[in-house]
């Protein structure tokens, strides 16, 4: 039997949207309840990180009517800070005009657009970008040519010397949110990161995301000072600016971010975030042949692949000895297996240029078979291979990394979500905060070792229970939509317990990097099981795949590579 499952990204987090769950109808004011829950947590646990003005904002919000609160939340949730009021239409708000007036009176929003422009809070472009090109042509028929693009129109209006006239043409109310950045701060304090937002509440309300009922550690906070919060938010703004430029390959804007980067931070979470951004910027500038700037940036970071990129830039600049020195530094103290593997390839390329002899390490050659298969439907090579093995009597699962990762998540479920200090700071986490650091193992060493010993002895207590009772609950490791009861049953009945424990031990050595590179197929028959990595024409084994295959070979775990070629119709 061939069980085919496929997902979009082999390195992605588990899919938690459950298609089998019935649709849930939300109350019209669902977002008001969610926002109040957000504010309650911020006030209760993070008050020391709020300024006097921010505390006043919270108090003023509580005094608003429900309509005014909902309108403010709607505006905060929209893109931008300026809005055409007449375009706003929310059925759940009984009287939107009264709500607007209340927000103006409490200084949450302003409609004094002329004054705001004179104070240089907003520009002419900010204001008129709210309008479509046809609307602008109707407003300013003598200033705009029909052939002008909208960007050209905005430039013309921005450079027009009578802004008072331009603003006088507007006959409808415009509103601007005051202190719009507050929402970003509240979300950051609540989630402890910059990528989750109010939509997370909605996904949970709809039942599309379910989370484990773990114990939240209210005594632990990611941020300890207001300065840390402000620095994080500022760095997030820079990061957002970079990613927008990256998407359009706007290298001028990317370069403009460089002088805005903050100095190295003593607070480790912020410094990690800073170095991650620097690596991205440096890599883009390297692609744009701005080698000197890219090299200077990479030298500011310790995160991989900084040293690899330094060596490659130096090679491109024909500074071979300097590149060789970087490579040797990597080999002396590699960050991980990937970095070490890359250093060997770079050393081989550099050896002749620096008058060194390169001694190639012994390479591992995995067991392999050659298959010529028909593919009239032009399917993925993994599907063709899976169907071939199915015809040979195997039950085949095309799961790649998801098979072993899901087993690991089920086996360690209670340990992953154990109440360890500092692990959980909000109700919407897929894993503890230290999941991919060395602290994960160190803080749970006794629990993990005890579990591994139990597995080696053939005790799989809790795996089936976790599969049944935790179904659909978000866990970074368990891929519910693809990992089936049959896959679990066959794994526990066919894989020797000692081999399962060995594979978990390798995962635990480096959870971030070892969670990928596993073979495409896992197969079972009456006599045993087999891993199979499938390679089509011209496809080569990657380093992390070779390392898993070498590990399997070392420990007697059955695995092979299937090299596939496709027969032509005349050969069938």
Residue locations for each model-derived region?
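Short beta-strand-loop-alpha-helix junction that forms the active-site gateway
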Residues: 79-83, 515, 526, 533-543
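Alpha-helical protein-protein interaction scaffolds
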Residues: 263-355
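Conserved catalytic cores of phosphodiester-cleaving nucleases, focusing on short active-site segments
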Residues: 483, 487, 491-503, 520-538, ...
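Nucleic-acid nuclease catalytic cores
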Residues: 524-529, 555-572
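Mg2+/Mn2+-dependent nuclease catalytic core
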Residues: 536-558, 563
